Design a protein with these regions (language model features):
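N-terminal processing/targeting junctions
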Residues: 14-17, 25, 77, 336
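N-terminal secretory signal peptides that target proteins for export/translocation
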Residues: 1-15
């Protein structure tokens, strides 16, 4: 079994150093159920775990996941169709800048690009590592983060990708920008990097890693799985054990935000400029409409208590979509994200 094919591998790779053997035992059954046999051929299905979603317009959207799965909707998420991708590698992240131009990244340095929203072609990666998140700020300028604290960049729509930044030998899980200059990248051990010049320079703002001289135990910051940027001053990051942090001063100070949620794993986050923040994870989904002062659990039909939410995207200024375990696609009902959410019937 190749556990690297499991969606949890991409989200929690490296967590054993701080979670320990007990946590890994709890995750074994999930890894086994999600594992794939190396080189095995498999027909793509509509119920593959989905790890990421992107809506460049209110109607047009794409989601990606295991076995090279890419789904497309042209009606705001009501119906979805599979798109051929030419790969069986797990696709961890997808992002579209408009209904034609999109990118998906994942296992073994996989980078896919479409210029018509229909057909996908491979782009050459300068590294063979796992690529965790892709974000484009224009149809030509984009970023990818992944293993070994690598940040890749392109200024020609992915015709050429270059290593823009690398630091410690950790995994960056996510990258997000609010414009073509201001962005953050986050990852293992609470590492946070910030740019205010479009990636020309990346500066570390938080994170630490050490090994105790007395016990030889690994010590480090809380793992961060996702970051969402509101404006040049404001950003949110989420991670292990229900950890949520926010900055309102461009990252000079990151403060923990209490949500009263159980210590579950928060894998994804999304936000808008109206003060709405959404957080999803292991059987958990939280929404704040007042910039984090209060948090509520929206009603899901069916309930997601036993499910996993891996990706959230905004599909309009007030409407959102979430994806996750077993091909789950959830849409917020109406203009208020606190209203009931429903799962799309595939």
């Amino acid at each position: 079994m190749d556990v690297k094919a499991s969606p949890l591998y991409f989200l929690s790779k490296g967590m054993t150093n701080i979670l320990g053997i007990v946590t890994m035992v709890c995750l074994i059954s999930f890894l086994v159920s999600c594992g794939q046999v190396a080189q095995q051929k498999k027909e793509k299905a509509m119920n593959e775990d989905l790890l990421s979603v992107s809506f460049p317009t209110e109607k047009e959207g794409w989601a990606c996941g295991r076995w090279g799965t890419v789904l497309h909707t042209a009606d705001g998420g009501k119906t979805w169709l599979l798109q051929p991708t030419g790969t069986e590698n797990t696709l961890v992240s997808i992002h579209f800048v408009d209904p034609q131009n999109g990118w998906a990244v994942g296992e073994e340095g996989t980078i896919l690009h479409t210029a018509d929203g229909k057909t996908w072609e491979k782009q050459k990666s300068p590294v063979p590592y796992y690529l965790m998140k892709v974000k484009f700020v224009t149809p030509l300028k984009g970023y990818i983060v992944g293993e070994r604290t690598h940040i890749l960049s392109t200024v020609d729509g992915g015709k050429t990708w270059n290593i823009q930044f690398k630091d410690e030998d950790f995994i960056l899980k996510s990258v997000s920008f609010c414009d073509d200059l201001h962005g953050w990248a986050v990852g293992e051990y609470g590492y946070i990097y910030h740019t205010k010049d479009g990636g020309v320079t990346w500066k570390k703002q938080a994170g630490y890693f050490d090994i105790s001289k007395e016990t030889e135990a690994i010590e480090g910051g809380n793992f961060l799985f996702d970051v969402t940027v509101v404006d040049p001053q404001t950003a949110w990051a989420v991670g292990i054990d229900g950890y949520v942090i926010r900055t309102v001063d461009g990252g000079k100070i990151w403060k923990e935000v209490k949500t009263d949620a159980p210590k579950t794993q928060f894998f994804c986050a999304a936000s808008n400029q109206g003060g709405t923040v959404l957080i999803g994870g292991n059987g958990a989904f939280l929404i704040s409409t007042d910039s984090g002062k209060t948090w509520k659990n929206p009603k899901f039909e069916p309930p997601i208590i036993y499910g996993w939410i891996y990706g959230i995207a905004r599909r309009s200024s007030t409407e959102f979509v979430a994806v996750g375990w077993d091909g789950g696609i959830y849409l917020s009902d109406g203009k208020n994200p606190l209203s009931a959410w429903h799962r799309v019937k595939m």
